[in-house]
């Protein structure tokens, strides 16, 4: 399974990010490209410990099952619900948010799993380094495909 910590796969993500521009249009969903590049930073910031999410009853009850679903081979479903913390309602500046996303992705490739602040995800529960890396890759890949890159 692809992993954001794998240097070659990380470079491919960076190359795909280079193809985005403020005129990029989604193939599905409600987010515009400016919102998407900011949204994609949020799960990475959770991994880094920059965003603290509380554990929820929903995560306690369904987190392990959802983790299996997210980590299974294949693409994520389109139009999945978004955690309210990750919803971007305003239209942020594309250039600054794009630069931030590229920088974070690059850091994940350079530092590897040492960027992970806590092994326990607030929704999915305990994750290995490989699971953290695979989840981050899969989420980014999903949204890059959403914008046809």
Q: Would you name each region that the model predicts?
A:
Residues 1, 24-25, 87-92, 128-130:
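Active-site rim elements
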Residues 1-3, 45, 95:
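Domain-scale detector for complete catalytic domains at protein termini or as standalone homologs
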Residues 1-35, 39:
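Long, hydrophobic N-terminal alpha-helical segment
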Residues 2-5, 101, 149:
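Metal-centered catalytic cores of metalloenzymes
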Residues 6-7, 103-104, 137:
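Membrane-proximal intrinsically disordered regions of secretory-pathway and membrane-system proteins
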Residues 10-13, 112-119:
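Short alpha-helical hairpin
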Residues 23-71, 118-149:
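Short, contiguous alpha-helical
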Residues 70-115:
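Acidic/histidine-rich alpha-helical segments that form the ligand environment
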């Amino acid at each position: 399974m692809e992993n954001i910590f794998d240097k070659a796969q990380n470079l491919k993500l960076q190359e795909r990010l280079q193809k985005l521009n403020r005129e990029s249009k989604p193939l599905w969903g409600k987010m515009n490209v400016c919102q998407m590049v900011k949204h994609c930073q949020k799960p990475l910031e959770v991994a880094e410990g920059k965003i603290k999410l509380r554990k929820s009853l929903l995560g306690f009850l369904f987190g392990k099952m959802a983790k299996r679903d997210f980590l299974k081979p294949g693409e994520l479903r389109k139009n999945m619900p978004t955690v309210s913390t990750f919803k971007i309602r305003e239209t942020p500046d594309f250039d600054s948010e794009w630069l931030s996303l590229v920088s974070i992705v690059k850091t994940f490739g350079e530092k590897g799993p040492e960027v992970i602040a806590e092994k326990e995800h607030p929704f999915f529960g305990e994750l290995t380094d490989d699971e953290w890396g695979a989840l981050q890759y899969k989420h980014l890949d999903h949204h890059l495909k959403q914008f046809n890159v």
